[in-house]
């Protein structure tokens, strides 16, 4: 009984143990691998806390969500994108989508897909809000005399030039599924399941940060987009609604990009 109580007491402070271990390993990494201390400590702490508090399903979904883009980047910059590369990409893509959906269903963080989770009016309102914040950021860009684009968008435009349009379009549209599953559902239903305010703030900032903002304009662009999508999920807790709004917005951007091209 004593040992059980002692272990239970120790479990309350597992975060302290994780952070201490992360700092120790980071110090070793600096001396052996010459890695940046603070970034290494932060990454190890986050990963350690995820496992310590049994949140590893989020980490799995996060890794899966990055596989298609990782494959595309490797193929595009190592050599000319071949037919075999395209086939491999779509195999990875399908496995990623299917695996992510099945993992999320098994973890019971999203319901089984059904038409009732696709309310047309709410989807239209969500899209309209994204369109509105896009106009606002465009006006802001004119006020500060800046080109209405971001480094992340420039990188995507460059990638578009060297990969097949089918691959680029698939990646763009799939972001609606993968990013909402990781940055909205994963944060609200796994990482901070019982802390809605922490969940909201984390989802808001993490989504914006992962899009690589480099200045005030890009932070505003992705921050406001994240605010709309995070607010939508916080209010309705409907993954399929968020996915639809995000996918529709990306489809709109894709069509505009193809027309301008």
Swiss-Prot record:
Alphabetized UniProt keyword annotations: Cell membrane, Membrane, Transmembrane, Transmembrane helix
Pfam families: Rce1-like
Transmembrane stretches, start-end: 15-35, 43-63, 84-104, 123-143, 197-217, 239-259
GO molecular function: endopeptidase activity
GO cellular component: plasma membrane
Highest taxon of source: Bacteria
Subcellular localization, as worded in the UniProt entry: Cell membrane
Family, as annotated: Belongs to the UPF0177 family.
Record's protein name: UPF0177 protein YvdC
Native species: Lactococcus lactis subsp. lactis (strain IL1403)
Gene: yvdC
């Amino acid at each position: 009984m004593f040992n059980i109580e002692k272990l239970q007491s120790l479990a309350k402070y597992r975060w302290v143990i994780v952070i201490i271990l992360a700092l120790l390993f980071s110090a070793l990494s600096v001396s052996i691998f010459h890695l940046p201390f603070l970034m290494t400590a932060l990454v190890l702490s986050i990963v350690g806390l995820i496992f310590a508090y049994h949140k590893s399903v989020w980490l799995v979904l996060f890794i899966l969500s990055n596989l298609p883009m990782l494959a595309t980047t490797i193929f595009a910059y190592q050599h000319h994108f071949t037919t075999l590369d395209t086939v491999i990409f779509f195999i990875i893509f399908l496995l990623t989508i299917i695996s992510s959906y099945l993992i999320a269903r098994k973890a019971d963080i999203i319901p089984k897909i059904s038409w009732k989770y696709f309310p047309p009016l709410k989807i239209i309102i969500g899209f309209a809000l994204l369109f509105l914040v896009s106009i606002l950021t465009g006006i802001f860009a004119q006020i500060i005399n800046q080109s209405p684009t971001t480094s992340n968008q420039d990188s995507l435009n460059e990638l578009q030039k060297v990969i097949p349009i089918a691959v680029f379009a698939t990646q763009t549209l799939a972001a609606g599924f993968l990013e909402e599953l990781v940055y909205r559902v994963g944060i609200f239903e796994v990482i901070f399941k019982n802390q809605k305010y922490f969940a909201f703030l984390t989802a808001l900032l993490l989504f914006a940060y992962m899009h690589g903002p480099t200045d005030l304009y890009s932070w505003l662009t992705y921050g406001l987009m994240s605010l709309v999508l995070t607010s939508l999920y916080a209010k309705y807790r409907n993954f399929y609604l968020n996915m639809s709004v995000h996918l529709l917005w990306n489809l709109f951007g894709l069509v505009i990009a193809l027309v301008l091209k």
